[in-house]
Amino acid sequence: MSKFFYFLTVVITTFFLLTSCGLFKDKEKDIDTSDSRVFPVETVVKPDQSLRGIKVSLPKPVINKTWMQSTNNEAHNIQHPFVNNKIRLAWKINIGKGQNKKNPITSQPVIDETNIYTIDTKAKIVSLSKVNGKIKWEKKLRKKIDRDGILNGGLAVNEKYLVVTTGTGIVFVLDKENGKILWDIDLSITIRAAPIISGNSVLILTKDNRLSSYDLQEKKLNWTHEGLEEISTFMGSSMPTVSNGIVIVTYSSGEIYALNELNGSVIWNDNLSLYIQKQSLDNISDIRGNPVINDNKLYVISYSGKMISLDLNSGIRLWESNIGGIQTPWVVSRFIFVLSKDNELICLSSKDGKVIWVSKLKDFMDFEKKEKNILWTGPLLAGRMLIVSGSHGIIASISPYSGKFLGAINIKSSVETHAVVADRTVFFLTVGGDLLAYR
């Protein structure tokens, strides 16, 4: 194939001519797609021919005021938040130290009714107005951690507390109104996941595949549960999921446990491991994407190439699909949107896991030399658009109904954490530590 077909455009889709930008209104940064050409890349996953003619239908977008956990709520399920059809940059602010080779930015912001909370790679917590980005307070936790930074962890907020986990193994519970440390505990083991707040308890998952439940007010250990320890894992970790008194925890070993939220006893368990010798990256059974609960069904994806749906109460497998990835699936109504490890954005039926459509995203900055792999993060469904962020500075929107490319902007800085949305505003945190608000 001639060089004419190799290009440095924003997003490659497999089946569609690119249309004019329909999401972002910042004209100075809009990507001009009028000269773009589609590179004919074959997708790994194929649409199921039995679903030809099936129309994707979504519930009406609803304004959500908060994003309290790293993936909005303890069930990791928000359905369809509202944003305007066209959004533009409302404000931008630097929240602290950006990432370096040792310390990537992995923690998404969390948002309550009035404020947005962030953490940088030096464990500085910032509380800002979600309306205009004005800083309300800052708190440096650096004296409590080692000098190399936090290396994973994350944030969660409720009506009273802001909970912070750090990669160095320390959990902090802060007064969210002023940043005062109410209590902290050193677990002496790396924490790679954000905390999950459920009622009066907080769930903490550590690198050694141990889940602990603590009382938020009394700093009391409620219970612990342990899975098999795994040597080969990805940076970061999935977070527990909670619904109807059941805690779902997925370990890097591929194990899935349903636990009683009150005492940690096992209700049922499963395993996504392929039971093969792990000699390559593709064989790692690590579950990095968060398990999602919707309508008493559980959806889990592993890197090794398995995505499954289970009955929440019994653990019975309802279906499985040969799709692997590290991003959290977005489940809404009867459909699932997921970004695979092959940079394919896929729409599946939540009933049987059959593929409805597939769109290929660009893999490399330089396709001919296959250099500089692009990491895509997402998707985020908002305002009838699927939003994905690229490590090359491109934020793109794709139709959830067809997989067609809608538009993109170049923010000229890598985004490697999941975008969040609250009160008609989409927030992006760049690797340089800049928080961008689009509304």
Locations of the language-model features?
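Bacterial signal peptide processing site
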Residues: 22-25
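WD40 beta-propeller blade core
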Residues: 126, 172, 212, 257, ...
